[in-house]
From Swiss-Prot:
<dbReference type="GO" id="GO:0009318">
    <property type="term" value="C:exodeoxyribonuclease VII complex"/>
</dbReference>
<keyword id="KW-0269">Exonuclease</keyword>
<dbReference type="GO" id="GO:0006308">
    <property type="term" value="P:DNA catabolic process"/>
</dbReference>
<protein>
    <recommendedName>
        <fullName>Exodeoxyribonuclease 7 small subunit</fullName>
        <ecNumber>3.1.11.6</ecNumber>
    </recommendedName>
</protein>
<dbReference type="Pfam" id="PF02609">
    <property type="entry name" value="Exonuc_VII_S"/>
</dbReference>
<dbReference type="InterPro" id="IPR003761">
    <property type="entry name" value="Exonuc_VII_S"/>
</dbReference>
<comment type="function">
    <text>Bidirectionally degrades single-stranded DNA into large acid-insoluble oligonucleotides, which are then degraded further into small acid-soluble oligonucleotides.</text>
</comment>
<keyword id="KW-0540">Nuclease</keyword>
<comment type="similarity">
    <text>Belongs to the XseB family.</text>
</comment>
<dbReference type="GO" id="GO:0008855">
    <property type="term" value="F:exodeoxyribonuclease VII activity"/>
</dbReference>
<keyword id="KW-0378">Hydrolase</keyword>
<comment type="subunit">
    <text>Heterooligomer composed of large and small subunits.</text>
</comment>
<dbReference type="InterPro" id="IPR037004">
    <property type="entry name" value="Exonuc_VII_ssu_sf"/>
</dbReference>
<dbReference type="GO" id="GO:0005829">
    <property type="term" value="C:cytosol"/>
</dbReference>
<keyword id="KW-0963">Cytoplasm</keyword>
Length: 74
């Protein structure tokens, strides 16, 4: 039975993949497989962040209705 990876575990795995790909010394087949794994991790991480944003919006709502959480890039 496999253990579910946390957001942080997945992010660390993605960072490792990026680091290895940036070196440029992997065989093409390995690099493509790593890239594909990385894309899958990005999609999972984005989904987790979207869910967290939706949860925060619900928690921060005064009237228990879903409201948009405005994010700024200050």
């Amino acid at each position: 039975m496999s253990e579910t990876k946390t957001f942080e575990d997945k992010l660390q795995q993605l960072e490792g993949i990026v680091s290895e790909l940036e070196k440029g010394d992997r065989p093409l087949e390995t690099a493509l497989a790593d890239f594909q794994t990385g894309v899958g991790l990005v999609k999972e991480l984005q989904g987790t962040l979207k869910h967290a944003e939706e949860t925060l919006a619900k928690v921060m709502s005064d009237d228990d209705k879903l409201t948009d959480l405005e994010l700024t890039n200050d």
